[in-house]
Amino acid sequence: MAKTSQAEGQPYKGYYNNKSQGQPYHGYYSGFNKSASAQIHHLARSLTQGVQSHYDDTYTTATMHPNGINPISDKTDPTLDPESPSFSSKRWVQNMWKLYQSDSEYYKPGKLGVAYKNLRVYGDAIESDYQTTVSNGVLKYARNIFNKFRKDNDDYSFDILKPMEGLIKPGEVTVVLGRPGAGCSTFLKTIACRTEGFHVADGSVISYDGITQDEIRNHLRGEVVYCAETETHFPNLTVGETLEFAALMKTPQNRPMGVSREEYAKHVVDVVMATYGLSHTKNTKVGNDFIRGISGGERKRLSIAEVTLVQASIQCWDNSTRGLDAATALEFISSLKTSASILNDTPLIAIYQCSQNAYDLFDKVIVMYEGYQIFFGSSQRAAAYFKKMGFVCQDRQTTPDFLTSITSPAERIIKPGYERLVPRTPKEFYRYWRRSPERQALLEEIDEYLDNCENYDQKQKIFEANNAKKAKHTYNKSSYTVSLPMQVRYIMKRYWDRMRGDIIVPLSTVAGNIAMALILSSVFYNLQPNSSSFYYRTSVMYYALLFNAYSSVLEIYNMYEGRAIVQKHREYALYPPMADAIGSIISDFPLKVVCSVLFNLILYFMVNFKREPGAFFFYLLISFCSTLFMSHLFRTIGAFTNSLAEAMTPSSLLLFALSTFSGFAIPVTYMLGWCKWIRWVNPLAYAYEALISNEFHGRVFDCSNIVPSGFGYPKTGNSVVCASIGALPGEFKVDGDLYLKLAFDYSYSNVWRNFGVLMAFIIFLFGTTIFFVQTNKSSISKGETLVFRRKNIRKMRKMEEDEEAYMDGMAPLDFSGSTEISDYSYDYMDRKLLDTSNIFHWRNLTYTVKIKSEERVILNNIDGWVKPGEVTALMGASGAGKTTLLNALSERLTTGVITSGTRMVNGGELDSSFQRSIGYVQQQDLHLETSTVREALKFSARLRQPNSVSIAEKDSYVEKIIDLLEMRTYVDAIVGVPGEGLNVEQRKRLTIAVELVARPKLLVFLDEPTSGLDSQTAWSICKLIRKLANHGQAILCTIHQPSAILLEEFDRLLLLQKGETVYFGEFGANCHTLIEYFERNGASKCPQHANPAEWMLGVIGAAPGTQANQDYFETWRNSPEYRAVQNELHRLEEMPGLASGEKEPDTNQAYAASFWKQYIFVVHRLFQQYWRTPSYIYSKFAMAVLCSLFNGFTYYKSQNSMQGLKNQMLSIFSMFVVLTTLAQQYVPLFVTQRDLYEARERPSKTFSWLAFIAAQITAEIPYQVLAATISFFSWYYPVGLYRNAVYSGAVTHRGVLMWLIMTLMFIYSSTLAQFCISWNQLADYAANWISLLLTISMIFCGVIATKDSMPKFWVFLYRCTPLTYLTSAMMSIGLGDSFVKCAPTEILTFPPQTPGVQKCQDYMGAYISIAGGYLLNPEATDNCKFCIMDKTNQFLDFMNISIHNFGRDTGIFIVFIVFNMAATVFSYWLFRVPKGNREKGSFFDKLPFLNGGGDTNHENV
């Protein structure tokens, strides 16, 4: 196959023919790799797609191997070996295609096309919605539920895609063009059968060669895939492991003979990594925002490579070129063309910024306009269609830019004389298209295509081809390539790879279990076999059961961590979610076994439980089964719910119910009738009965306390009795089985029955986990809608109706042809709106970063300036140092050191107000999602403008900026999240506006303001930047993919290559000055219609596959332009007074506003966020109310018997369980605020870190007080603790004190959460610390074990635990100064010393006066009935609690709250506040649990 005459190394512009027959295209395109090494890797799109190698060969694989060879076993051809420097992915594809064709009966190649007709898509939402708040949340939720039952009601749905039609044959490459919100993503998702969140209307026809969408979903899912814009991967897997997993899941049964699955998978992984330039990252972790790994660009290529391995026939790519430069994006599209030409793949690609070279590779184009398809057809005829309509394509305007400009009224240019003839609205364009001859021809072609699919039975061929790939024992109609057992095996291997990649997690889990076993068992160390150990044996058994059960609680977090990835793999037909669930359960099993054995082995023997082998192994079996039960329960909850917030409340209530009704807190005989049924459906109750029956059965315990005892009382005989349930008069031993029967109503005969019930629950929950994980659909999007505050929604709808009526009734607009967007009035004051006379300049800026032991220079001697009224473009390839330079200039570096260079304003050094004197528009649009646009702008203006400016002036300035940036139509809209809130362009405008309202007196930095935007939005943003400069603003802006038209909006260019300057100067008209400079210095001539940006990147060797012909850094340093720059910098440095004027009073202040003003505004915003986050508030109140009510009515009006007092104590203790959930619920909210603050507001000096922390602490308190108040009334009175105050006549007083201590308890939970998250980067880590600290506190607070029973070593923890003082305060107020009345089973019965003669009161009088207690029959002479307690204070004394210490205990508890607040402030300052020129101290940067990771390379340091 001969090559074209195109120059080597230049991007292929290509000619294609006979696509449907699978013949390859003729041409050359360069590789993906940017290095100068001999091994150049090339980008490809599908498993067997590829490109021409970089060197020139005289013959191709097609001529060498007419029938193809097996490249896995035959290594004779180096061009087919991915480990060879001579590897050519294009030749590999050609060889594989020949191999498939050589035995088509075995390989059965088959591909799909798609035809759609009358396709209409609608969503269940309105085009604008109102924001959910605490006040309207319940009403809105009820309305949404009601609307789900309304059918075919247009009031509650809107069209996303209007009826459309198209035909894409196998081997054709199609581009989908349109602005954000046009429906491009919805169209691709519809074609890919991803219709969650919207509906395909009845009557719509979508045919994949005669196959329906239902058949695709159920039987051929992997043949049609959708690749989203974002990347989701397991961060702890390496690149090689990620791709190998996908390859194993898609390894076909009909692979080349003699090749194992593992060999095949390894080979294709090596091929795609070589193809995509990922070979060097094979053993590198993927990483994410918090775990170091590959770079963002490499992560994008990894996503592409993964889809490549799926081997889908129809691939729907949604803006997959985002973040790639123009040259790299071109190579990606070229690879898709290769795949289509050779293998008959059918890719559809939505691209927002498409170059002309890339566009020329497409066969067909779809143009979308606000849900209407206004053109479908040949990419070469699209421009002519709209030109014939009456529109003009400007000089240097690319065809895709022209096509998308048609959908923008402000940008399309109308041919003179056609002003009243061309369509204006989307509906008019749609009508024009539906009447066009192009559409009529398309409909005829679609009908013919559909008839042919039925006549030639193409459907059967596709199913046969799909079945040929499937492994043995795989269901014929399954979408998956390998069988379920194989899927589970590969998933288990992936799970272990993930565990190995983050080995600290399993090791810390094991270590945590050992530590908790040692702590718990040491508290109850070596219990003696006597009656005094009964309470401790049952309590430690209870706590051990709960620990074994709750050890799986974090699995609910894991369910959400990987859900997006599992759903993605399901859509790729790698495996069903049930396979992942089964695999993870089996993979978790060994770790559970190890943890369970270690914990229970240590606990069992240190506590001195029953020393019999059978008893030990039965204990181990029941404990482990309890762990499995709770694991499956948490997995079921996670599988059933769609978010962690949804799962928290039901899981917490279930935990509370299961632990309360396990049999220890409330024995069976004390359970109330209304809730006794819970015991029968509570597996932990069966487990607990089995455990303590196993412990007490067949044992006789010595008596440790005889009643009566002391001087004058006999030590033997029937007149004394053991003070224990189950004791008999005259007996000094207690039978274990009798104790169980009387105290718990338990019997040893039930232990194996209980084991069977426990296993039944495990099996049942395993089934429910599999069912829900397979059937649950993740949260769905409603489509892109604006969200307003409820009070503004009617006003906005009225405005929209008036505007629509006006547009429908008016005549067609008379366009002048100008592309200028509407501008703000240019009177003098408005021109001065952003005016500044300050000049920012820098010289010889050098920045280094230490990577391992190497000092790497990232920026090397950079010079430049930014003057008012000028827009300076900062350009270069990825990794050139653009963002790094912006961060260095704006003092935002988070690592590394500026080793030399100066940064000045008007010749003077930078002062402490510099950071708030500039605006920095970050690439990421970071905003608080609950704020409105106006609120976000006012917040920035009020805190960042000088304190001398009044609030009214600041607000007035905000309104001017709103008009300047044309944001008036959505100024009252909620920022929201993508899909429900502002769209991409609106978010970018808001990001710019937030910086402008601060009225930066120096300049504005913009980092990639057009990244991810469509070409028209990018053009709009650049026009906006130009407008700002015209108003006097100085601007420095990085830009990645500018078209020739966009470059006209910039005045100067700073061009970087590998951290060095290669040009700094003016663009000139039509970039003439720039072009002349490079051509004068040896560059090839710039073609007349070429994009100067792409040309200059190729000249300096920054584009893939290009090589610079000289060192342009040295060329620049020796040029006259460089000397002119140095002279100008010298002039600026010698003029320190230039336009500086009088210094403002706050010049040297880091913040414009005072601390108290900062604090007030931040607190106000926090209260707004809370009010507009009803899910958090509802969850908090639901937890407080439901748990309290459940607690209160579980222990409803507990009597003052000895068991009743224990019940009241455990009721108080159970309230502590709520603290963990309340604290963990708060953590994600804090993280949201902190991420915004640290990413945008702290670097811009909006407000101080102390104001941030103080506001966080303050904002929680009112809601905690309210939650505590509701909880108090829901619990205190149902339990009946108020009755204990009746005897002392202090019912009201003690009720108020109990409310006070409960309020402090709730406040403590929030301050503990704030302390734990203040120094932890991840919410999960903070949640673990919260759980650990509260668990230890609950062990040592004196309830599970009293102070006197603890080993002396642990007494210090008893005194240091805040819950000790909380328990003491609540129990003294709740139980003190009342009387005890024993239950019948608690009454000790024995005769006096001389029965029939001596009265009981005479016999027991001396004992009662010393030990307390009371007689029920003091006058009796035969059998004395004695209760060992008569006052509740005796019970408190046993617990080391005194009612007189309430004030002391409350005060100490308040000290703990204050300590948490102080520790929050100190730890945040220590670990997260920038110190000096560093964002975080070098020591703390090394602690992975404190700080995020990032990319291993330093493209954006």
Swiss-Prot record:
Residues annotated as domain ABC transporter: 140-395, 840-1083
One matching Pfam family: ABC_tran
Record: residues binding ATP: G876, A877, S878, G879, A880, G881, K882, T883
Principal cellular location given in the protein's record: membrane
Residues in compartment: Cytoplasmic: 1-502, 776-1175
SUPFAM superfamilies hit by this protein: P-loop containing nucleoside triphosphate hydrolases (SSF52540)
Entry's family note: Belongs to the ABC transporter superfamily. ABCG family. PDR (TC 3.A.1.205) subfamily.
Stated name of the protein: Opaque-specific ABC transporter CDR3
Lineage: Eukaryota, Fungi, Dikarya, Ascomycota, Saccharomycotina
